[in-house]
Swiss-Prot record:
Pfam name, any one: Peptidase_M3
Name of the gene: oct1
One GO BP: peptide metabolic process
Taxonomic path: Eukaryota, Fungi, Dikarya, Ascomycota, Pezizomycotina
Manner of cofactor binding, per the entry note: Binds 1 zinc ion.
UniProt source species: Sclerotinia sclerotiorum (strain ATCC 18683 / 1980 / Ss-1) (White mold)
Protein name: Mitochondrial intermediate peptidase
Record: transit peptide: 1-27
Length: 785
């Protein structure tokens, strides 16, 4: 089965983490901290210092940016070069030309593969199918990004049409049994496989497994049923996510009963002394955290944890359809189908990991519960014994508020994090670890979708230009607030045969050279002696700038700094994972491995040696006192065990719902959820009558892989401690440590068994096999610092 890259359907760990911590205010507490170690000498290229200065200025100085971006202005004498320098995309009509040109190339490849009959022809099947995948992704991924991001409605519509055309063709290919059979012949011929590169073997295996998942080997009637079920799931899933509703939409109280809640918030929802609170949203969450009246908190808690009957029905129907699909595809469960190509490999292995992690985490949670109980017993207004479900957030909030009152340091943190200095810091860190830096590059007319977008070229000390990064980081009306990393074009080797094909296109005047035509005008490099299309990445954030004529730069909160580091972790994986084949480039790896580089980057964001590279006051140039960060980190981790317990139980719930249980006529999603809370939790269990699982929208996107968030947190923490020495003695900025991470993990993209990557980077052969024992070992490592 051929797949487009597209944004991952699961929520990245930063987003999940923000949901967990959104109920907490900004607060600080004292903790032990260490002074930053001296930073190693910088042996960078002569142009690096100029790039470093310019990098800060293009983000922090509006005047400098206005001068720098003059070249991007379009005029009669300077026609547009096309979005991302894709020569087809100079106007809306170009999307159709781009799609049709790519479609014709794809059809020629399909014909070639289907007609293969000699050993020499079969030898090219894996690489041909990889190029076929690349041609689909070139249109689908880029068009999907443009239709969601571009401000011009005509361009959005054109991108949507191009997307639909290529997506439809991709679905046709996924039911073309001849492609699967030809791949099977090639893989079954030892003489052919012996001549393949390691990447070709991996890609062939990936494609074969994907074809199997699409039930391509089933009889026609069953295959048609598979397609019908897949279509139903694709309709029920979004319907469940988009239209989930609570059993009660509002609760009404006398405003006098809401003592403790922000009076401004209460007034916003009050009419004639009656306060009407929506049961979904910020007001209800704030009430549970702050209202002193326990009975009011209980009523609001019950309503916020109870989905409507129709919502729960949709959820259970989705789970049933997925279970039927798995059975039809000859799998025991949907989890077994989904996990076969992941690091976990099986539901049993995920269970091993989660149970080991729960065991490690349980004693931490018990300590947190004891602290909450102690605080509750000191409260004269407490009206019930023990810790109730509606007490947890309230007393957590009270404890954090009591600590916050002793220090206000973190309120001033943002003054040390102008966006330009943070981008400088990322470039300096990547230079020290991996020998690559971010170099501002003037854009051509029509190259970007908004005048705020900055282009950065990624320059390697050894390989020259290795990637293009488009940064759309500032807030504007109508823009999505969600941070994201998009791969617009993957790394891939361009063959001599492709250049010969491209020579016909270069003759039409659209392209100057065959090399340019082979990659639609987008960035390429021949530094390694082989022509490659370069990774082209878009980074989206929503950082607020000062309005009017203020010269103050965009200042980031520490959480926003962590978010930017996280997203750049995805980017560096794409940048360093420059493989010869598209299917395994960069972030195209196992779902439960994809977040590792980005979660690891969050550790760097909090390290004193890394922060000393860039964190300085935007006005005084004073270096950031690290104790301010240490206090912020201590507060963020104050109830980390409880957060982790919730994630463990939700991961177990995801597995249980995607087992064969939904096929039983007595399947009851509420009973399963409450039973998992009872069995594995130290926190209070949801009371009877609630059914929160109806709000668990990630069940559709994750589909058996919700554990990935926890799994990659554990892996990242272990690598941080073992490879980078937890930042001690300058380990976070040491080139040798960065080289080990690059050589064992990042450079492979998805072209190597991730368990081998893990065993190699940790020098721990115990986990190389990736079996249930390995999963249990990983679980025992825990997530707590």
């Amino acid at each position: 089965m051929l797949k487009a890259v597209m944004p991952r359907p699961w929520v990245c760990s930063r987003c999940v983490k923000r949901q967990i911590q959104s109920s907490r205010g900004l607060a600080t507490a004292s903790t032990q901290y260490r002074e930053p170690r001296p930073v190693p000498t910088d042996h960078s290229a002569p142009g690096a210092k100029h790039d470093d200065r310019t990098l800060r200025q293009i983000f922090d100085s509006p005047d400098f940016w206005a001068d720098f971006s003059q070249s991007s202005k379009q005029s009669y004498y300077r026609p547009g070069v096309g979005l991302f320098q894709n020569r087809y995309l100079v106007n809306p009509q170009g999307f159709e030309v781009f799609a049709n040109t790519s479609l014709r190339k794809a059809q020629r490849i399909v014909d070639k593969v289907l007609k293969a009959s000699t050993v020499e022809e079969y030898r090219h099947v894996a690489r041909d199918l990889d190029r076929l995948s690349d041609l689909l992704c070139r249109v689908i991924d880029l068009s999907d990004f443009v239709r969601a991001t571009h401000p011009n409605a005509a361009i959005q519509a054109a991108a949507s049409r191009a997307y639909a055309k290529m997506f439809e063709y991709m679905n046709i290919l996924n039911t073309t049994t001849g492609l699967d059979k030809q791949l099977e012949v090639a893989m079954g011929t030892p003489e052919i496989v012996a001549g393949w590169t390691e990447e070709e073997v991996v890609v062939a295996d990936i494609l074969k497994k994907d074809f199997a998942k699409s039930a391509i080997d089933l009889p026609r009637a069953q295959r048609e049923k598979f397609v019908a079920l897949s279509q139903e799931i694709s309709e029920i899933g979004p319907d469940f996510v988009d239209y989930m509703t609570p059993a009660k939409s509002y609760l009404t109280f006398e405003s006098s009963k809401l003592k403790g809640m922000d009076p401004v918030l209460v007034r916003e929802h009050t009419t004639w002394g009656q306060t009407k609170i929506p049961t979904i949203g910020g007001a209800a969450a704030a009430a549970i955290r702050t209202v002193q009246n326990e009975e009011v908190r209980r009523e609001i808690f019950m309503a916020t944890r109870t989905a409507s009957r129709n919502t729960v029905h949709k959820l259970e129907e989705l789970m049933r359809k997925r279970a039927e699909l798995a059975k039809l595809s000859r799998y025991e469960s949907y989890s077994q189908l989904a996990l076969g190509d992941k690091m976990a490999k099986s539901p049993a292995s995920v269970t091993q990991f989660l149970e080991a992690l729960a065991k490690d985490n349980n004693k931490i949670v018990q300590g947190e519960v004891s602290e909450l109980l102690k605080f509750k017993f000191s409260n004269p207004n407490a009206s019930s014994p023990g810790l109730q479900p509606w007490d947890k957030d309230y007393y957590m909030s009270r404890i954090l508020a009591s600590v916050r009152s002793h220090s206000r340091n973190s309120d001033f943190l943002s003054a040390y994090f102008s966006l330009g200095t943070v981008m400088q810091g990322l470039s300096r860190l990547f230079t020290r670890l991996y020998g690559v830096r971010l170099a501002p590059h003037e854009t051509m007319p029509g190259e970007t979708w908004n005048s705020d977008v900055r282009r950065l070229d990624v320059i390697s000390e050894t390989d020259g230009h290795v990637a293009v990064l488009y940064c759309d980081l500032f807030s504007r009306p109508g823009k999505s607030p969600n941070p994201a990393h998009f791969t617009l074009r993957c790394s891939r080797e361009i063959t001599t045969a492709e250049l010969e094909e491209a020579s016909m296109l270069s003759q039409n005047g659209l392209f100057k050279t065959d090399e340019e035509a082979a990659n639609d005008g987008m960035a390429t490099s021949k530094s390694s002696g082989v022509l490659k299309q370069l990774p082209t990445i878009a980074l989206i954030c929503d950082f607020v700038t000062m309005s009017g004529k203020s010269s103050r730069p965009a200042l980031l909160s520490f959480n926003e700094v962590q978010t930017l580091f996280h997203e750049m972790g995805h980017a560096i994986h794409s940048i360093l994972g420059r493989t010869s084949l598209q299917n395994v480039s960069g972030t195209r790896c196992a779902t439960d491995f994809a977040e590792l580089p980005s979660v690891l980057m969050e550790h760097f964001a909090a390290d004193p040696s890394v922060l000393s590279l860039f964190a300085r006051h935007y006005e005084t140039d004073q270096q950031l006192p690290y104790e301010m960060v240490a206090e912020k980190l201590a507060l963020d981790k104050r109830f980390e065990g409880s957060d982790t317990e919730n994630q463990i139980i939700l991961s177990m719930l995801d597995l249980a719902y995607h087992s064969d249980l939904p096929l039983s006529p007595t399947f009851n999603s509420t009973e399963i959820y409450h039973s998992l809370q009872q069995k594995h939790g130290a926190l209070p269990v949801d009371p009877p009558g609630t059914c929160w699982q109806g709000f668990f929208g990630h069940l559709f996107g994750y589909g058996s892989t919700y554990y990935s968030y926890l799994f990659d947190r554990v892996l990242a923490r272990r690598i941080w401690q073992v490879v980078f020495q937890g930042g001690e003695a300058g380990g976070s900025v040491h080139r040798g440590n960065g080289e080990k991470m690059k050589e064992e993990v990042l450079k492979w993209g998805g072209g190597r068994d991730p368990w081998k990557c893990l065993a190699g980077v940790l020098d721990d052969g115990r986990v190389e096999n990736g079996d249930e024992k390995a999963m249990a070992i990983v679980g025992s490592w825990g997530v707590k610092e």
